[in-house]
Design a protein with these regions (language model features):
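Conserved ABC ATPase "signature" region
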Residues: 76-93, 369-387
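Helix-to-loop junction immediately C-terminal to a conserved catalytic motif
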Residues: 14, 306
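Conserved ABC ATPase signature
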Residues: 96-104, 392-396
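Catalytic Walker B motif of ABC-type/P-loop ATPase nucleotide-binding domains
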Residues: 121-124, 417-420
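ABC ATPase NBD Q-loop/coupling interface
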Residues: 23-39, 315-332
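Conserved catalytic motifs of ABC-family nucleotide-binding domains
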Residues: 117, 413
Length: 565
């Protein structure tokens, strides 16, 4: 959970912190001895959650080289290390740091560690801001480095990442609460929940299918393994002719008044295009999710709504007001809009929680009594206990800071709530609480919610509309299940074109086996919700099952029906 001591533990491994008592041995060296500081830091590479905390250069190449330069790597070797590290994370040496997305910056931080060639790599929530494909690339890279003999220590709240681990440690309130293999820990879901953790979606699927008799074991730790097991136990249910259903458009979407409209919006910095002819609308009272890879322009798009960024050309309307017009009342616009940035701790500034939350209401011309009332109600609404009211910000966990920032926005009673990656870095309990808060604000208070998220399973939980952005363009817009399904078809089409292969129906198969190659399929579906990933695999293998389901119960029922259990 947030605040359990994981990041503190990570800093001890790198000798950024020392314990008050006890012994810490790193590679056989006593971390308490002053002469071991440099040798330990050469051995242990550290990647933090927020890349801005460890980036110092203005150009990618310069930043990646910094660490290796400081341990006196010869120039010729340094150049090769930087080239290799950048190739591993897929970045160009000449890119400027300030032009990168949060995910792009995190790749720079990882490359900087790789260039130092450490024996141990500690990633402290380092994948939390990455899009699904970038996260998959980083985790695959870590597995490759592990095969080369490098020890990987991954601190994470993303339960799906635990599926890759050989050994898992659970921390709670500064203590080691559980440890063991994934099989051992995932067989104790109730105990995990005591510590604020939930089973990964993949494991939930395996357990639910085992309970319904679709598979005879619940120890399955990937959607690939689940699909293969279902095929092995129910081969008769799979058709020889394997086809995919055509995508459809959800025609039942409710028609509401358009609240936010983008008309042919473009944004360029010099020759670099950020947004390209963006046309979309967000309905009044709706819950809209914006998804897409890092660097697609999602955060930029969000910041245009309250006129924090102006487009190069095109028009943006909010409640009929053209915010791109020089005569627009921007102050009135911003009173309607609550905005939570990607790193919410950066918008907290007061001496304690209460003072931060009450600051906004105090500055909009209402009475002190009303301002205090709004602040206390907002703090209570986001589920923060009374004993945090007077706490300074540095005493709060990341999840608590996220809720303080949200409380400050809620206290302003906005019509629109815009959040950039509100779930990133939250533990399962914090994520669940955040989703409950957003759900209540949307359904009960009627607030229009717009979120940027990389969490597909969370998106399908509540969003009524999804916008998919890539390379500054909106490629898909519609109901979540339709958008994710069309993304799968689009991705397969793109991969087929790139690999100069032929499509058989809507599939790309390995010529020798007639099956999609595992790497191709895994890359194509990694942006999709976990349930849809499994259904697509089964459909490709020949099971006559719809690929449109995104919820656990309906997915399991569809598979049960298809295999005839």
């Amino acid at each position: 959970m947030n605040g359990s001591g994981k990041s503190t533990f990570a800093k001890i491994l790198n000798r950024l912190l020392l314990p008050i008592e006890g012994t810490v041995l790193i590679g056989g060296l006593d971390a308490m001895q002053e002469e071991n500081i440099i040798p330990i830091r050469k051995m242990v590479g550290m990647v933090f959650q927020n890349p801005d905390d460890q980036l110092i250069g203005s150009v990618v190449e310069e930043d990646v080289a910094f660490g290796a330069e400081n341990i006196s790597v010869p120039h010729k070797e340094l150049v090769k290390r930087v080239e290799d590290a950048l190739a591993q994370v897929g970045l160009a040496a000449s890119m400027r740091i300030e032009e990168l997305s949060g995910g792009g910056k995190q790749k720079v931080a990882i490359a900087g560690v790789l260039a130092m060639k450490p024996r141990y790599i500690v990633l402290d929530e380092a994948t939390s801001m990455l899009d699904p494909k970038s996260r998959r690339d980083v985790l695959q890279l870590m597995k490759e480095l592990q095969k080369q003999g490098i020890t990987i220590i991954l601190i994470t709240h993303l339960m799906e990442e635990l599926l890759l681990a050989d050994w898992i440690y659970v921390m709670h309130q500064g203590r080691l609460a559980m440890k063991g293999s994934r099989e051992a820990l995932f067989s104790q879901p109730e105990r995990l929940r005591e510590f604020g953790l939930e089973l990964p979606m993949t494991v939930l699927l395996a357990h639910a299918l085992a309970e319904r008799g679709c598979v005879r074991t619940k120890d399955l730790f990937s959607v690939e393994a689940i699909a293969e097991r279902i095929y092995k136990e129910h081969p008769y249910a799979f058709l020889k002719e394997k086809t995919m259903e055509p995508a459809s458009v959800d025609k039942k979407a409710k028609v509401l008044s358009q609240a936010i409209v983008f008309q042919h919006v473009n944004l360029s910095y010099g020759k670099k295009s950020i947004l390209n002819d963006v046309c979309c609308s967000i309905e009044k009272g709706s819950y809209t999710a914006i998804i897409g890879p890092s660097g697609a322009g999602k955060s930029t798009l969000l910041q245009m709504i309250p006129a924090l960024i102006s487009p190069t050309d095109g028009s943006i309307y909010v409640d009929g007001m053209e915010v791109t017009d020089t005569s627009a009342d921007i102050a009135a616009l911003r009173k309607k809009i609550g905005f939570i940035f990607q790193y919410p701790e950066q918008q907290l500034f007061a001496k304690n929680v209460y003072e931060d939350v009450v600051f906004g209401p105090r500055n909009v011309g209402i009475s002190e009594v009303e301002a205090e009332k709004r602040a206390y109600e907002a703090i209570q609404f986001v589920g923060l206990p009374q004993d945090v009211y007077d706490l300074p910000m540095d005493k709060l966990s990341g999840g608590q800071k996220r809720r303080v920032a949200l409380a400050g926005v809620i206290a302003m009673q906005p019509d629109y709530l815009i959040l950039d990656e509100p779930l990133a870095g939250l533990d399962p309990v914090g994520k669940k609480k955040m989703l409950q808060i957003l759900r209540a604000l949307h359904r009960d208070a009627g607030i229009t919610v717009v979120v940027v998220s990389h969490d597909a399973d969370a998106v399908v939980e509540d969003a009524e509309q999804v916008l998919y952005l890539r390379d500054g363009k909106i490629l898909e817009q519609g109901a979540p299940s339709d958008v994710f399904y069309r993304l799968w078809l689009r991705e397969m089409e793109h991969m087929t074109r790139d690999k100069h292969s032929k499509m058989n129906g809507e599939q790309m198969r390995d010529r020798s086996t007639g099956r999609l190659s595992e790497d191709t399929l895994a890359e194509a579906i990694c942006e999709l919700p976990g349930c849809m990933q499994l259904l697509i695999r089964l459909r490709i293998m020949g099971l006559p099952v719809s690929c449109k389901h995104t919820q656990l119960a309906e997915t399991v029922q569809a598979i049960v029906d298809a295999v005839g259990r």
